[in-house]
Amino acid sequence: SPIAAVWEITMNCNMRCKHCGSSCSGPLPDELTTEEALRVCDSLGKLGLQRITLSGGEPFTRDDWHLIVGRLTKNKIIANILSNGWFIDEEIAKKAVDAGAVNVGISLDGVEETHDYIRKKGSYARIMKALDVLRGQGMSAAIATSIHKRNIEELPRIKEILIEKGVQDWQFQAAMPMGNMLDHMDWIPEP
């Protein structure tokens, strides 16, 4: 049976990232209701799934995200959340802990100027604050970076920043020619 999965719980997103492979903007008209999503959680538990990452879009734009995490936890599935970090404050962090989330991953795609250009002005500062808030709640935080020509030279500086913030988990993915990235093909590194 499957061990791990990624579930895009919404295509709704407050950002319009230049490299988003899913071209997220608003919610799809046929997104799952809370009741449907909770049934999916139960089905995943019956399948024996061990861990899942909730992503999107931006998972925290769903009002019921904590109910989904809670149901996954009830089904003995380790739940992680991948976020752009914009909405993470004390309340969100506490809800994540209370619902049983094990980790919150945040996308960081460069130093402040680069990251804000790619994602949204002010988002870098919110991520730095979110990392402090999550640590204050005892929540493990990971960083995910999409690597492309606009940020590859910044990786050593990003590493320094993450060490300063106490981040121990840094994941990379190569920017792929899909979604919004199709408008920025010159960013894709050569093999």
Predicted regions, residues:
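A broad structural signal for short, well-ordered beta-strand segments within beta-sheet-rich domains
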Residues: 1-2, 167
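Canonical Radical SAM [4Fe-4S] cluster-binding loop centered on the CxxxCxxC motif
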Residues: 3-35
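Radical SAM/AdoMet-radical enzyme domain recognition
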Residues: 31-55, 61-190
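Short acidic donor-binding/metal-coordinating loop in glycosyltransferase active sites
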Residues: 9, 56-57
